[in-house]
Amino acid sequence: MARPKKKGRDIHGVFLLDKPQGMSSNEVLQKVKRFYQANKAGHTGALDPLATGMLPICLGEATKFSQFLLDSDKRYIVTAKLGERTDTSDAEGELVESREVSLTEKDILAILPQFTGDLLQVPTMFSALKHQGKPLYEYARQSITIEREARPITIFELKFISYEAPYLTLEVHCSKGTYIRTLIDDLGEKLGCGAHVAILRRLAVADYPADAMMNYASLQHLSETEALEVLDEYLLPVDTAVRRFPKIKLTTMQTKAIGFGQRVKFDNLAQIYGMVRLYSEADLFLGIAEITADNVIRPNRMVNL
């Protein structure tokens, strides 16, 4: 007779994991899900195994809003090794080209402004983007190159941190869809020496604070030594995933109507339009909705807590 499946928990919130180097995002996602005994979990944009840093993991109803974190700005600190290009544009790849590095800090500072603002970036072949249903990295591992279209990205800030040849360290504030490996590869070509990512750490996703992260070893220790209620204390509320949207409080009647999936007329004195966070009179998070041009609240994604 098959052993009955262990029942998980309907636990809801966002856990800010400081992802360790060497583990894939999906691997740590499954570990965190198991530590919390959660029925449902999802991450908000993969980090390469080489990379460390912030990986928000959504549990339960928070998974409904993971796309909004995926679409949010990110901050990284990256150390590039100049003079070497690899096939993956990071330290885990095969060396494909070596060049002499004879750059000064002044040379680098003169180039950096060309990599800020609205740019077009061609994604690396070693990415999870799909072609005919298969990730590009699977083609790359078979030495097959697929033509990729350049995609619009925004580098809000590219801050010089240090340069001790051949290592250059930068802080990057960027839009969704930015490949730091590609950015460094492109920068290396512009500098005339080539480059690849040696160290990569994600500092922030959206406006989540770095000091709210917990490292994997600490979480694992808690899961082995403490009750689940202790782990639950480290979950951030579901609505933090959509904190960038304005907050709207509904009356009891409006809350009931929204609960039935109905559109509700809204006395829009503040003239707020677009996506908003909805709350009950008791300040309970209900979900997100769109306020239309004719002042109607149209439910988008509602929670079931």
From Swiss-Prot:
One of its GO terms (molecular function) is RNA binding. The active site is at residue 48. Its EC number is 5.4.99.25. InterPro entries: PsdUridine_synth_cat_dom_sf, PsdUridine_synth_N, PUA-like_sf, PUA_sf, tRNA_psdUridine_synth_TruB, tRNA_sdUridine_synth_fam1_C, TruB_C. SUPFAM superfamilies: Pseudouridine synthase, PUA domain-like. Keywords: Isomerase, tRNA processing. It catalyses: uridine(55) in tRNA = pseudouridine(55) in tRNA. It is an enzyme of class 5 (isomerase). GO terms for biological process: mRNA pseudouridine synthesis; tRNA pseudouridine synthesis. Responsible for synthesis of pseudouridine from uracil-55 in the psi GC loop of transfer RNAs. Belongs to the pseudouridine synthase TruB family. Type 1 subfamily. This is tRNA pseudouridine synthase B. It comes from Haemophilus ducreyi (strain 35000HP / ATCC 700724). The gene is truB.
